[in-house]
Amino acid sequence: MEDKFVILDFETTGCDIFNTPPKELGYFKSKTWYDPIELALIDLSSGMEYHYFIEPHPDFVVKGKSWATEVHGYEPDKFIKRDDLQKWTDVFPEVQRVLTGKTAVAHNAFGFDKIVMEQTCEKYNLMPPLCKWRDTKAEIKKMYPDRKHSQVDVAKWMFDETYEAHSAIEDVRMLSKIFQSINEKPDWIFI
């Protein structure tokens, strides 16, 4: 049976509520990530796009604690006043339906997106979707070791394109192109 793929991207507050000191393994490994504020998915088997702005968990709406605004552009005071925010518990049943039995594809899946999914589900006492995961960042590092591997850089050298990075919906649209390009290449080329 052929795998069905779902392109996925989270944006999170990036707020370090536990004042975790940076670890040698890097920024992403020293954080707690049950703080999604935006999620986008594209189900490649149907072409359907899903895009949610998510009400952050109250733990991450703390006076004096900044978000990763320089990355995604969302300012806490403005974001929490949006009228299109949904609760994770309301969004999750559809996310689970879309992902279950398929392969989630994300750029930095094993260093970020999969962890966000697992920690958020754990925080809300939900079972994560039963799906496989693929990490395009790891795959591109292996396939093109001499190239830059951030998604923005890959879009530039692979397609000579720029896009609105760190908007979850724009990230999944670009990652869909990147993934389909690298997924078409036979494995024997990289032996």
Predicted segments — roles?
Residues W133-H149:
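Short alpha-helix plus adjacent loop in nuclease-associated cores
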